[in-house]
Regions:
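Short glycine-rich anion-binding loops that position phosphate/pyrophosphate groups of nucleotides
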Residues: 20-23, 44-46, 162-163, 197
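Hydrophobic/aromatic beta-strand patches that form the interior of the parallel beta-sheet core
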Residues: 16, 37-41, 53-56, 156, ...
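Short alpha-helices
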Residues: 41-109
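N-terminal small/polar loop signature for handling phosphorylated ligands or for N-terminal nucleophile
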Residues: 1-30, 34
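Hydrophobic helix-and-loop "lid/oligomerization" segment in the mid-to-C-terminal part
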Residues: 11-12, 92-220, 225-256
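Short glycine-/acidic-enriched loop or helix-start segments at secondary-structure transitions
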Residues: 25-28, 50, 203
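Generic enzyme active-site microenvironment
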Residues: 17, 40-41, 91, 125
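Short, glycine/charged-enriched secondary-structure capping and boundary segments
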Residues: 29-33, 53-56, 104-105, 207, ...
Length: 256
């Protein structure tokens, strides 16, 4: 089965960025599409308004909620494929409805999806949240063993370097969703996942269990996101990056 498309297949006439709060989060596509984004559909309050037109609904639990509301306004029929995509986007953005950003409207939308299209949501939930590859389980065991604790155990940090990936022979795609692991430790207020991108570049994912505003913490380091889930990109040696994170989190926790 063939999915997706090759960049050379067509020249896009209208480009939409969904759930992308900052142009730098486009990654490798920044140089290609960065100055060509016609519309951004988002729910991050930290959106930097980089697109020609921007639709941000900060009260939405997920960007796919906003997409769903647009689909209703435009009277677009809900096909099985559309329903699967909307549900998957909502479920993943809300941690399968366990995050604080899950609203009553979020549940209403899912009920409407279920009522109007016979999609097996349980199957999607299992595939997205329960099933793990052998490589993923290896990574989870490894990062749990090397988890670091700071600020009287209020901050936990896991680091996934290129050396770890190479040693374990695990693909980088297995790293998705690791950010929730540090918060599983009792008493932790902020959990941080560091993923090495290149020699002196690290992608930071930050999660908050209580009152710490990780959006503000990450914004102080050039990033952003939600109050409970945010991220940024840091440069330097791993030790320098760790120190920068610890200092920023210490200030963020102190201001709560």
């Amino acid at each position: 089965m063939r999915t997706g498309y090759n960049d050379e297949e067509f020249e896009p006439k209208f480009i939409i960025a969904a759930d992308v709060a900052d142009i730098n989060l486009l990654g490798k596509y920044k140089d290609i599409y960065g100055d060509k984004i016609n519309l951004c559909i988002d729910h991050h309050i930290s959106n930097t308004d980089y697109a020609e037109k921007t639709l941000v609904c900060p009260n939405a639990s997920a960007a796919c909620e906003v997409v769903y509301e647009l689909i209703k306004i435009l009277n677009i029929p809900l096909t099985e494929d559309i329903t699967k995509c909307i549900y998957t986007g909502i479920a993943t953005d809300t941690g399968c409805f366990k995050y604080e950003n899950t609203t009553a409207r979020c549940h209403e939308i899912v009920a409407e999806l279920k009522r109007n299209c016979p999609v097996n949501f349980a199957k999607i939930n299992r595939e997205m949240f329960d099933v793990k590859s052998k490589g993923r389980l290896k990574i989870e065991r490894a990062v749990t063993d090397i988890m670091e604790y700071y600020l009287d155990d209020k901050l936990t940090m896991i680091c996934v370097t290129s050396d770890i990936l190479n040693k374990m022979k695990v693909d980088a795609s297995e790293l998705e969703g690791l950010a929730g692991i540090p918060l599983q430790v009792e008493g932790v207020e902020v959990g941080v996942t560091i993923k090495q991108k290149d020699e002196n570049s690290y992608k930071i994912s930050m999660r908050s269990a209580n009152n710490a505003n990780v959006s503000d913490i990450c914004a102080s380091m050039g990033g952003g996101g939600h109050v409970k889930a945010a991220g940024c990109l840091l440069h330097g040696t791993l030790d320098e990056v760790k120190k920068q994170i610890v200092d920023a989190v210490a200030k963020g926790i102190k201001s709560c």
